[in-house]
Each structure stands twice: as C-alpha cells, then as structure tokens.
Amino acid sequence: MNNVTERYVLDLQEIDESQVAVVGGKGAHLGSLSRIEGIRVPAGFCVTTDAYRRVVAQSPSLDAQLEELSRVSPDDQEAIRTLSAEIRRTVEEIAVPDDLAGAITRALARSGERTAYAVRSSATAEDLPTASFAGQQDTYLNVVGPAAILRHISRCWASLFTERAVTYRRRNGIDDRTVRMAVVVQQMVFPHASGILFTADPVSGNRTVATVDAGFGLGEALVSGLVNPDVFKVRHGEVVARTISAKQREVHALLAGGTREVPIDAQRQQQPALTDAQAVRLVELGRRIEARFGRPQDIEWCLVDDDFHIVQSRPITTLFPVPESADQENHVYVSVGHQQMMTDPMKPLGLSMWQQTAMVRMHEAGGRLFVDVTQRLAAPASRAGLLDLMGRGDPLVRDALETVLDREDFVPSLPDAPPAGPRAGAAPEPVATDPAVVTGLIERSQASLAALRRDVLTKTGPELFDFLPTAFEEHKRVLTDPLNFKAIMAGMEATWWLNDKLEEWLGEKNAADTLTLSAPGNVTSEMGLALLDVADVIRPHPQVVEFLAGVEDDDFLDELAKVPGGTEARDAIEAYLDRYGMRCVGEIDITRPRWSERPGTLVPVILDNVRNFEPGAARRRFEQGLQQARKKEQEVLSRLRALPDGERKADETKGMIDRVRTFIGYREYPKYDIISRYFVYKQALMAEAERLAQAGVLAEKEDVFYLTFEEFHDVVRTRQIDDRLVRQRKDAFRAYQALTPPRVLTSDGEALTGAYRRDDVPDGALIGLPVSTGTVEGRARVILDMAEADLEAGDILVTTFTDPSWSPLFVAVAGLVTEVGGLMTHGAVIAREYGLPAVVGVEQATRRIRDGQRIRVHGTDGYIEILS
C-alpha cells in the first residue's frame, strides 16, 4: 500500500475506536465491530479525515464562510439555512485530487468496480459516548462505479453542513471549524429484512429489555418512516411482547444502482419480518456488541439467508445513566433534585460537596443525586411511612414507587422495620409551641456559622482540606439536632392536621394556606420582601434607574456610586447581598455563581419592583397577609364552634393554628444555614483554585469544578492535575444537560416519572399538585432564567423549578406553575406565604404553555386551563 493510500484510505479491519479523529465516529465503531468474534460486518474501507482536510483546503472561500457561521446564533434558523446551503455547494464543487481519487479507486478494485456499495458519512463529533448524531449527515445506498462513488463521497463531505447538523453543533457548543468528515464505503448487502436493535428500551430506559424494530427489504423504509415496523420486546432470552404491523411497502436495490420503493403483496404484509427465534438471536448478538462498547447500543442490522449483518452501531445517548452499585441486587432510587427543586445537572465538585454534607448516602448518575430507598420499600411499616410521606409531598413520586412495587419480586420483602417517617396527620412531636424554640435554634446555628467563618480564614493549602471535613461534621451536627427535626416536623404536621381536619369538619380544602400567610421568621419570604425595600431606595432616583437598565456585567456597584443617588442605591444592594448574597439559582451546587459573585442577576428583578410597586409595598404586603390569616382564623373558629362538639374542635384547631404559625416559617431556615456554609466553603476553595491558576497548575480556576473534593485535595497536595480527566468531565456535563432526570430510577435503568390518577379535571387541562389555594387568571410568563425576568403585575410565572433564590420574583406575580415540586418544597411554601395560587409538578409545563398565553391556575384543585 503506497503512502497516499495509507494516509487517505484505511480498511475497516485496520480501524478501532481509538481512531475517531481519523475515521470519525461511525468508522471507528464499524472498525471495532469488525473485530468482535461472531459479528458479521460488510467489508469496506474508510476515506479518512485527512482526505477531507486535503480537499477543503483547496477552497479559500470556505474559511470565510465558516467564520461567518461561527457568529450566527443557534436560534437564527434562517441564517443557518442560508449559510449551510452555501457551504454545502462550495464543498461539493471542489474537485477530488487525482492522487486521492486513485487511492479510492484502488480500494474499490479489491472487490471489483461493479460491486455495489453503501457510502456513509462519518463525522468526528458523531456517535460518541456523549452525543449521537444519528441521521444528521447523509448515507447513500447501492452506489455502483468509481465515478458515482467519488461523487457521493463529496456529497457526504458536504453533508457535514446540513442545517440540522449545524444547528445541533451550535446548540451543543461544538465549533463547526473543528469537526472533520470521514466517509465509510461498505459493500452492500441485500437483505430479506432489516431494522434497528436497541439493546435497552429507548422509551423506559430498562436495560434488561431489548427492542427490535424490523421490516422487509432495506432499512431505509423504516428510517424514513415509510412503514411502521414490527416491534419485538426481548427480555432474558425470551420475546415478552410483539407488535406485527401491516407493512405495505419496502425499499429494494436496483441493478444499475440506487433504490426504489415497491409495494408488498397483500398476503405478505401481515407476516412478521422476523421469527421470535431470530429476534432472540439478534438480541444475543446485540448483547455481545453492548459488552464490547460498555454501554447500550442502537444497532442497524440486515438479515441475509438467516445470517445477521451489522451495518452500524452507536451509543444510545438519550438513556439516563444508572447509579453504580456494589452488588447485583435490584435497587430503587428516588431523585434528590426533585425534593430540592433543582433538577439541573451538577458539576463533580457540587455533587461531591453535597454528598460530603448530606445526612444520608447519595448515589450519582447523570450529574444528579439519588437516594436508594430499596430497604425502606421492602418492609411493610417503613414502606407505608415512605409512601405516605411521598404521597403528601409529591404524588408523582408515590405513583412511580407504587408502579415498581406492583412488579412482582422486584423489591424483596423484609420483616417490619421502624416507619420511614411520621405518619402524615398524626399527633405532632412533643415539642412545645414556643417561639423560643425557634429562636434558640437560629442562635445556635448563627454561632456555629460565625465560628466557621473565623476558623476557615486561617487555613490554606493542605491544611484547608484537612480542616473542611471537620467543618462538614459540624455542619451535619447542626442539621441533625433532634430539636431541629422536631421543629420542622411540627410545622409540617400541623399543616397536614389543619388541612385534613378542616376539610373533614368544614368541607374546606387547604385552609392552612391562608392560615399561614405572613407567618413570622420565614427567611426566604423575607428575602423577597427585602428586595422590595431595595427598590424603594432606588425608585426616587431616575438616573440610578437609567444606569441599572444599562448594566451588562457584574462589576457595576462602584460605578453606580458615581451616579446621583447611587451611593444610597449601592449601599442598599450591598446590604441585601450581605444577608442573602450566598443564594443563587441551583444553589445546592456549590459551583453555581452566587448573587454576591454575580449581582447583575438581581438587577432585572429590582427594576421590575421599581416599575410594578409603590413605596412601602413590602410592609403593606406583610400586613395584608397577616390580616387575612387572622380573619381566616376567626372565621374557622366561629364555624367550628357552631358544630356538634364544637368547642373541643375549635380549641384543638386554635392550638394547631398557633403551632403552625410558630414553626412553619422555620421550615426555610435550615436551607439558609446550609447555603450560608456552602458560600464559606466556596470562598475558601476558590481562593485555593486562584492560587493554583496563578501558579500554572490550572488552565483556569473553574477547572476545579470538574473534580471531586478528594481530587481537588490531591491537586493541592501534588500540584498536578489530569487535564484529560477535566476535558472528559466537561464533555460529560454537556451531555447530562440534555437529559431529564426521572423522579424514580431502578437499577435496571427504568426511568419512572409517575402519573396523576385523576378524572376530576376539565378536558385539556394540565394536571398538577395543588400547593397554594386560590384561582387566578393572567398572562403566562415562561421564564427559564431568573436573570431574564421581565414581569408585570398580574403575570403568572411558569418555570421548571423554583428553589429559594426565585422568591424575589414571587412578590411580582399573581400565580405560579412549575414542572417540579411538592407540597412542602420551597416554592410551595413561599407561594403559600405570599398567597399565590400555585400548581406544581406539571409535566412539561414550560413546553405545553407558551409565553404570553392567558391561563387560569386552579391552586385549590390542582390544574391549569389554557384560555388563549
């Protein structure tokens, strides 16, 4: 083989998955497939990325076109459409150099020039473990003759710039100038049947269930949607379900090259494309391929004379990963993010820090954290307690868990264990209804936090990392104080008691929502009201308002002081940040930028408050809530006294109202304490990262976000970092951003989101969990980023989740709809505190409700109507 051929053409037998940069993702996979014993891969070769680079270098105009494309927004589809079409034309018009054409022709001659081939694109960013580009570049079947093959190779090069492929790369942060295209040229096989094998169920995620899609003829009939496939579900070597479709057409190869659609005889349309035995045998081959690549695969196959040929295999990148387990037993995991109102992926340092400081062991998968509840589901008493608690908080979690429990033998039965938690509505823990209990807890927390701030100042380098585990233990000691748990549960149980008893006695739903308005000591609701006070300072100064409207970065506070009225405005903002600046969206991830680090995040909210409220709004709002709560209390007690045994019922209810108002505000304080400590940890850790960056150990200080706490410690100790590991973690994090975490996940990989089992809502309504009573109609504002908020009075906030950092927006809206949440999650608590009708846990709310639509939120009954 001469040097030109060696550089530009590689036989599939010469290729493995380490050569992605040379032969692209598809080529690397096919080369690896051809090395697996028992797997038949059609013979062929790969035209390398060096050939692509050689060809496109002949067109000076291409660099300018790619530079222009790099500046286009991924949302500007018209510009992408126009530019990508121009680039494709440019690439197709470039002549293939004679020496390259000769190398390709010589490779073809080994099988005979009249042999039919499939010509397939293979991009360097394609079919990788973290991103599958299926269908984004072109494949041409039954291509015959050197001239036709060279022409179709050029078309494959050009298909690197299809509109869909460019948009995908732009959205996933992949530079179009860095990707290269190889081309796979494989001998055609002419199958009786063909299709796709998923070695894991692509819908449920279950790794034990393989799905086979099958049709007659070439696979293009399935890929193009020309026919509905036969579907076989195979588990543990047995077909457990099959659907045989009426297959009216198939795609055949033409003798002269190309393909055509042909009708299928009526008597053959209902015949299965595969027998059960063939489907099982195909899955066995798929399991072998899956084992070779180490993850579930999406495999294209052809059946010729009862032999399966594999023409492509790529990772299934849409599956949610499964937590690692030390055994082979069944496990059931519950999402932590759904309880914490933060379902975005976390970076490795964030995951590691939350695990270090958590009260229970947590398992990582897909950049999220999960708790293993298998043991608690196994025994009747603990199962009942867990399901009751989950059912009160998030019915979708309970439904998902019950779905798993309905599967025979998935969760083994164990003898009774103590209940997982107190039964909802039961008598509260024996803690006195005394505000001094809450005051004492807060004082002890503040003293511990002050000691942490003092002690951490003296620690750097390895000494810091030796100290922090001790700080984590103190962190957990404060949180696990038995009185802390009793105070939190007292407020929650009193809420449940009031809602249960007042619905039973008076027929009134969710009465506690009104009875808890303006409850004292809620640090999160106080945070939202405090930003109204900041707006009061700014409102009288038009030049300050104008200055803030033009803020584009986070270094604005010093410049603000130079504007008339700016000193007072700066002082008010800084005072707010001193108390609440440790907070941010997704605050359980220590790597997320805090308000103190990015104060510009708050500017749009401040300006909305300036525009939408009159001076003194915070005080008035609190007083209005307080008066509503008192009025409701008097009304409820009066109605109870008119009932049989009314005095007893009224006395018990009065005690519970006092109890809920004493303790429910404290529900938000432990999270405030956690995040306050996190900011102290972060400041110390980032000072260390800054020193490492200045010393040249780190390329940038934020690289430590992609290390665990222990790995960060090792870097500080050794002054060395594994740059390759950091790059891999960054790629994985980008992939995790495209995944939606399930509420419940099994060790088989099955992702369960749960369902609402209700038939009491209007047709077309969106169902959710009612968490704050009342009905409101208004304009939907679909907001995914708090920094982009633009709200007016009467708007209804629609978003994915709301952790405590969103509470400043709550003061400006009339209602709340979220995709994630439960009865006692932070957004629900604050919605009740502010008297906002709210429905949470509405699946895909941000997609099903369009920004600007008029909607009606039924916060008492738990559904949303779209009005326009």
From Swiss-Prot:
The keyword Membrane does not apply. One of its GO terms (molecular function) is ATP binding. Its EC number is 2.7.9.6. ATP binds at residues 26, 120, 135, 139, 186, 300, 312, 314. It catalyses: rifampicin + ATP + H2O = 21-phosphorifampicin + AMP + phosphate + 2 H(+). Signal peptide: none annotated. Disruption phenotype: Disruption mutant fails to inactivate RIF. Mutant displays a modest twofold decrease in RIF minimum inhibitory concentrations (MICs) compared with the wild-type strain. Residues 410-430 are annotated as: Disordered. This is Rifampicin phosphotransferase. It comes from Streptomyces sviceus (strain ATCC 29083 / DSM 924 / JCM 4929 / NBRC 13980 / NCIMB 11184 / NRRL 5439 / UC 5370). The gene is rph.
